[in-house]
Amino acid sequence: MENFVLYEEIGRGSRTVVYKGRRKGTINFVAILCTEKCKRPEITNWVRLTHEIKHKNIVTFHEWYETSNHLWLVVELCTGGSLETVIAQDENLPEDVVREFGVDLVTGLHHLHRLGILFCDLSPGKILLEGPGTLKFSNFCLAKVAGESLEEFFALVAAEEGGGDSGENALKKSMKTRVRGSLIYAAPEIVKGTEFSVTSDLWSLGCLLYEMFSGKPPFFSETVSELVEKILYEDPLPPIPKDSSFPKASSDFLNLLDGLLQKDPQKRFSWEGVLQHPFWKDALRGEDSGWASEDSPFSRNVMECSGPHDSRELLQSPKNGQAKGQKAAHRLSQSFRLENPTELRPKSIMGGQLNESIFLLSSRPTPRTSAMVELNPGEGEDPSSPQKTSPLSKMTSGHLSQGALESQMRELIYTDSDLVITPIIDNPKIMKQPAIKFDPKILHLPAYSVEKLLVLKDQDWNDFLQQVCSQIDSSEKSTGALRAKLNLLCYLCVVATHKEVATRLLHSPLFQLLIQHLRIAPNWDIRSKVARVVGMLALHTTELQENVPVIEAITLLTELIRENFRSGKLKQCLLPTLGQLLYLVATQEEKNQHSRDCWAVPLAAYTVLMRCLREGEERVVNHMAAKIIENVCTTFSAQAQGFTTGEIGPVLWHLFRHSTVDALRITAISALCRITRQSPTAFQNVIEKVGLNAVISSLASAICKVQQYMLTLFTAMLSCGIHLQRLIQEKDFVSTVIRLLDSPSTPIRAKAFLVLLYILIHNRDMLLLSCQARLVMYIERDSRKTSPGKEQQSGNEYLARCLDLLIQHMVQEPPRILGDILNALANVSGRKHPSTVQGKQLKMCLPMMPVVLHLVMSQVFRPQVVTEEFLFSYGTILSHIKSIDLGETNIDGAIGIVASEEFIKVTLSAFEAVIQYPVLLADYRSTVMDYILPPLVSLVQSQNVEWRLFSLRLLSETTTLLVSQEPEDGDEEASCDSDSSLLALIRDELLPQYEHILMEPDPVPAYALKLLVAMTEHNPAFTRLVEESKLVPLIFEVILEHQESILGNTMQSVIALLNNLVAYKDSNMQLLYEQGLVGHVCNMFTETATLCLDRDNKTNTEPASTLLASLLDILLGMLTYTSRIVRQALQVQKSGSRGDTQAAEDLLLLSKPLTDLISLLIPLLPSEDPEISEVSSKCLSILVQLYGGENPESLSPENMVTFANLLMTKEDPKDQKLLLRILKRMVTSNERLLESLKNTGSLLQALERLAPAHRLRGPWAGISCALFQQRAAAQGIPELPPYGIPCCGPSHKRVTGVKLYPC
């Protein structure tokens, strides 16, 4: 079976993911749909209808597979998106484009109908665009053969999958909902419930043409009933393009749409009318003639078909399964009918093993967030358009199975950087060679350049070769001849560096001649140069034919090395050539994918190379031998297998550990890494010989490449299970790997993540150690570097893939950890003395709770970890903790008191981390209220002070978050139920404890009051509960206890609570007044206002301003309440009723101390905070209305300056009038204040400037009247009001002291 490489995700539905893929070993790209098995009927239907269709306008089916968890459908890749996307982006298309697209639609649909296939659910989302713009039909999930029942087919496939048909009728019923397509494009007869037909498909075709031109379908509505009404009874409006610059529809196009959208199928266009329509301008002439030559048998016979066929016949009998009564039955491909339902089966893995390893994840990055497409039947499946998104689709959290995870991990063990190839010959890191030069003067043949050699004609090339061979084969032994021969060999070394020249020389008679001279050359100078030429040819050639005597050369070189093994210089000359020839043969054999006898390397060659590796050899010889093994073992070939001996691993390790040259150490460990890729036992032998600790210590090497290769070796070992149990239990190993995450090298960090993933898969306990060693921090750091949208640097793609797999695995761990903890706690629930086995289970499970804490504190893991299941499990654990706190369960004896308290503390801390992000709780509001808050309320009553405080804080903050969240549309009823449950919980369980809670030291009262604040804000009726629970006296006791710290959290909370109590319209204000509300408010207001007005102390200004705003609201509420009571009393008095005004007078007397705040309210009027300024003015206005100028300090010099400045700076006439009314009330009710006003020049000047603007009306009239009277009395002038304005205006009532009487 061929494998496929998966690239980026290009689509996603509720049960399907679409990838761009490639068939391994080719450059053929495809679309690969990975679908859950519950969609087998739809996918089977798609396959049976299209597996033999080859048409330019239909997406080609390639093959399908079944693995353990999924169905995989491989189809043609369309890169242009869907027609739906095109319409959405362009809004509407010109008529010429509609015609061009329409030709493709008609051609494809016509071909399907000729084959007897009805598409049934034609919509823009199921039409894909190939790159050049060709439209193709896709997603045949709901298509069918004319006349058959799709429900029966689906039920039959599902029954066969289930192993029988005992429930076939039930299956048929359940399938009815699965075969419904999009109603928007359905024909009227389909809406009425009749079967699909050719004419119903043509109606859908008309809808598509209409939508392409106008940008919207002919019939559309938000409600199904209204849409059905339109389809059945309304005529479509003429299509109008959204872009007004586009020309209107032509008469031919309107005529075509009218013919296709006829509600009566008998009047609707047939194929003949469609194909011959003038709108197409002869573009469908070929289709038209093809249809005419067939005499339209299918169209007639389908409409004459008496009824649906039995799908069992269609599946089981190719004869009976064909449409009854159809004369053109031979046109219905027999591939649509199956003699046996098991005939049409997806391919499975060889050997019957169902796994997903045939689909390999490519090295390209997969986007973390992909656009989702709804792939359910009827929604339109779009394998190549990531833009198509269904509003109903939901993200599915598909976790990889362990087999699939490890399959992807194995693909990541070796990267390109692990398998880099560098030359063996002329490698400067091994040995620096002098540059090769030749003298053209003594060459005795044309010194052709490489460029010239490439363009030589065959005859010239042959002549050139003949001259070269003749000169090399010359038997002359003079010094000049030898020098000329050496010069020629140098020339050949130079030209052999070009690939094409090297390939031609290698396959020429010259190569055989060079081999001969290796054997018979008169001196070693010639032999070394010949060997160098052969090595250069082997290095640069691009192919190797079987007739080239390369094995002969290898054998000869092996013999020469063996015969002269004591000569280090000769080995340095011959080993590079031997290595290049071995690598050449290995690469060619790997390319051909099978072993060839003509390339069988003699065993002596391997023996010689092994001897060159051993201790005692020269460093250069060791390096060359290691380099040969490194290069050859990069390939999967028989030549590489020749090195897989028991001693190769320890020999390379010894070379690595004892060499003093870094380049040699890197080559040795690289060779070991690559030979371990061939045979993992090579590294296993090393560990067994030198010990695991010695090998682990090598990870601390200062050489990055060494660290990289060591990590690769350990990953390979872990992947095949060798020494698995030892490695996953070795804490030093884990700690060393985690320290490598600080490396600046991206590949090292990626491989460290991969090693840790292998460890964590097999030993969950190491997750705790890893988290304590800051693994989560490292993951967050590298996740930011590899996040989508950032420019990807080299190696970041590989890092992202390793990181993604690690994150996927770690996300699955919290549910397992919580499940284990729940099982352990459930086993000891209610037991005072757990058994030894139960205690051991507790010791294993409870210490893992910090892992959950680490993950929920991480922005990478938190959104994936906090689910409804997580919160439910967490709430259940809290219930067990409640049982432990009440003494019903005892775990202290099993795990110790310290461990028990630590477990509870970490558990509470985990939820504290969750509530820092309120958005996570929005979707699970009911779960939190039902399962988490009740045990928290119980823990508030705990005897353990720390748990009690912690639980109260969590309860307070959680409740504040939950009650402040608005329920989503449709969730109002559930939200109401949750609120009722919360209210009952707090009323029955918590409020009775408040008398004790509020008297505890800080910060307990602050959290308790914060909860009351949240509840009274969210549900004002909760105020009644506060009063009924007799908490009001306790609230004022809290004020007395904490009044010295006015800015503390407790005072802030109590002031906010008082604000809510006063603001509630049905609040029992009398109760508040009886508890000393007025005095407390005066004291708190005075202290807070003083802090706000203190310009020298800016530290407390901001918190004091916030607190002052709340106190102003309280004061305003109190004054408003008093004003309402007084107004009611005056109305009773005015009406002549004998109503009692004593209550109002008592309230006025009780509230009179509030007049002392006037001198503080006036300086607050110019506040920069508009809220403080506005509320202060309202409070001041009501105070002077109630008490007039009772406060002699009201118009102190400082306050009058404030009034003067405000009158001159306020531009809004309403603000000026309010200030004037306040002044008028003060000066007309208190002569002392009037005298003070007369003696203050700045305020008088301000009033005089405002006089013309107000023309002596309203409040200005009252002030001027008072001033005039006082001046007249001083000068003996009769008391006549200026300009004839009455002194006090209309008759009104005035309050002085505590009596109510007329003015």
Curated annotation (Swiss-Prot):
The gene is Ulk4. May be involved in the remodeling of cytoskeletal components, such as alpha-tubulin, and in this way regulates neurite branching and elongation, as well as cell motility. PROSITE patterns: PROTEIN_KINASE_DOM. It is an enzyme of class 2 (transferase). Residues 384-400 have a biased composition (Polar residues). This is Serine/threonine-protein kinase ULK4. SUPFAM superfamilies: ARM repeat, Protein kinase-like (PK-like). Residues 4-280 form the Protein kinase domain.
